[in-house]
Amino acid sequence: VAEKAKDERELLEKTSELIAGMGDKIGEHLGDKYKAIAKDIADNIKNFQGKTIRSFDDAMASLNKITANPAMKINKADRDALVNAWKHVDAQDMANKLGNLSKAFKVADVVMKVEKVREKSIEGYETGNWGPLMLEVESWVLSGIASSVALGIFSATLGAYALSLGVPAIAVGIAGILLAAVVGALIDDKFADALNNEIIRPAH
């Protein structure tokens, strides 16, 4: 049990570093307030051991505050760029990288999870429906994965995607906002409000 707890802690610490790094990178486009929100999310991830992710309904209610914001309408060129970037993600390669984060899971299990996150993220960008992506994380927890490990793998996958983006700055900004919205919604309702009030409106 002690070993498992140690692996979990390591996963959360490394995921937290990855999200903070992603916040710094995307914060170059979105500004210091975004970096601060990403840092807050990263700190929450780091301390998530023993905690539970929010329910699907609560998380979706938070996320919908962001996606319903008219300023978050994504034009076709940006949407295509973001979908394309997901299509180019090598799930095995990403799982290997994430496998270095911790012994809390097997790389083979993560490949399948990366594939699912990719598939549901593409659906989110293409249809505007992020429910399937949120249900995916919930299904991991229902299958017996600790909330903290589920949050860690999920956040790390999205963070690795965001860090790999070689797309136009506006598209990077959109991906960054959505990543913070999706991960933040699983942790606390406050992140949606912060993104809406401090990042999205001023950016447009």
Swiss-Prot record:
One protein family per Pfam: Colicin
Keywords: Antibiotic, Antimicrobial, Bacteriocin, Cell membrane, Membrane, Plasmid, Transmembrane, Transmembrane helix
GO MF entries: pore-forming activity
GO biological process: defense response to Gram-negative bacterium; killing of cells of another organism
Residue ranges crossing the lipid bilayer per the database entry: 139-161, 165-187
Subcellular location: Cell membrane
Coiled coil (residue ranges): none
Family label: Belongs to the channel forming colicin family.
Role: This colicin is a channel-forming colicin. This class of transmembrane toxins depolarize the cytoplasmic membrane, leading to dissipation of cellular energy. Colicins are polypeptide toxins produced by and active against E.coli and closely related bacteria.
Protein name (database record): Colicin-A
Gene name, Swiss-Prot/TrEMBL: caa
